[in-house]
Amino acid sequence: MSRVGVVLLNLGGPERIQDVGPFLYNLFADPEIIRLPSPALQKPLAWLISTLRSGKSQEAYRSIGGGSPLRRITEQQARELQSLLRQRGLDATTYVAMRYWHPFTESAVADMKADGMDEVVVLPLYPHFSISTSGSSFRELQRLRQGDAAFEQLPIRCIRSWFDHPGYIKAMAELIAEEVRNSDDPEKAHVFFSAHGVPKSYVEEAGDPYQQQIEACTDLIMKSLAEHMGHSNPHTLAYQSRVGPVEWLKPYTEEALEQLGEAKTNDLVVVPISFVSEHIETLEEIDIEYRELATEAGVVNFRRVRALDTYPPFIEGLADLVTTSLEGPEVSLDAAAELPTKVKLYPQEKWEWGWNNSSEVWNGRLAMLGFSAFLLELISGHGPLHALGLL
């Protein structure tokens, strides 16, 4: 029997307060997160942003117990998925590959090779594809695969996204139904989907399918929920976790909550649609920040649907994804990460960024001036970045 390695891709998260700064550095050093005209700027900017943001982020992690539960939950998901796959007759072993914190992707690949796997299924724990989540993880795995003869020869099947998988939709609808039924008036309870946002340019310029998949997924869940409840509920989709001054997908969660409060919404059922595990965005951002904002805006009852975590129908859905993938053709990492519009993180043609012999000198001077301004603001504690809420 073929030995199957199932690689579960996820973001990762700091498990201790002292891990927050290094975790943020790894996050912002990824060109999929911040796109810059030169790779030489990536690490200095990542150091600067992680230094400036670590204090605020540490406070957030302290409010949920001092660290992220993401690794613990993901490893439990992996164990239960492995158990279920073996019950179905597969010789499967699961591996957790985090992008920005331990256990890193390199560790998962090393363990998989040491265990002598015969083929690989790559399953991102992101239902919806985005450049900055599944895309970044696929490309990191491809980087490790290139030049590694033992890894390169393994047949590989990548699951690009699964936002419309019946098992996922069913599990989400069931958990939402639990909270809707507990509302004062279940038929009028307003279902509020809060998805992690991405910059608008990802969708409009790079061809990222994330927004389309989120919207389609929301419609499928609401249809399934109506079948469970026997009636339709009003619902809203908004996007959270915006960082920086650039425009992200709208409506923003904060603004949508304020509007629902002004409309005298009595029962609000909040659904973390793009998150399959409890972590900082659910436990702190939604449960603390958004709950307070919604209450102040006038929402009477604020309920949050629990994350899928190890909910049995969800684990069954993941197992279905793996078995279906094994029945189909190989899907390469490059194919899984492909976008309709090619994204050039660092253009090979310098003119695409306005560079020529003279402008390159001025770009360097401006970059040094900007970096000096960053450092001055860091030392003084005052400046435009503080005004924009970045620091």
UniProtKB/Swiss-Prot annotation:
What class does this enzyme belong to in the EC scheme?
lyase
Enumerate the UniProt keywords alphabetically: Cytoplasm, Heme biosynthesis, Iron, Lyase, Metal-binding, Porphyrin biosynthesis
Q: Where in the cell is it found?
A: Cytoplasm
Q: Which Gene3D superfamilies match?
A: 3.40.50.1400
Q: Report whether Cytoplasm shows up as a keyword of the record.
A: yes
Q: Does the keyword Lyase apply?
A: yes
Give the metabolic or biological pathway.
Porphyrin-containing compound metabolism; protoheme biosynthesis; protoheme from protoporphyrin-IX: step 1/1
Listed under GO biological process in this entry are: heme biosynthetic process
Q: Which cysteines are joined by disulfide bonds?
A: none
Q: What is its main location?
A: cytoplasm
Positions with a binding annotation for Fe cation: 196, 281
* InterPro entries xrefs: Ferrochelatase (IPR001015), Ferrochelatase_AS (IPR019772), Ferrochelatase_C (IPR033644), Ferrochelatase_N (IPR033659)
**The EC number(s) this enzyme carries:** 4.98.1.1
User: What does the record give as the reaction this protein catalyses?
Assistant: heme b + 2 H(+) = protoporphyrin IX + Fe(2+)
An annotated GO cellular component of this protein is: cytoplasm
GO terms, molecular function: ferrochelatase activity; metal ion binding
Q: What does this protein do?
A: Catalyzes the ferrous insertion into protoporphyrin IX.
Q: Which family is it part of?
A: Belongs to the ferrochelatase family.
Q: What is the protein name stated in its UniProt record?
A: Ferrochelatase
Organism field: Parasynechococcus marenigrum (strain WH8102)
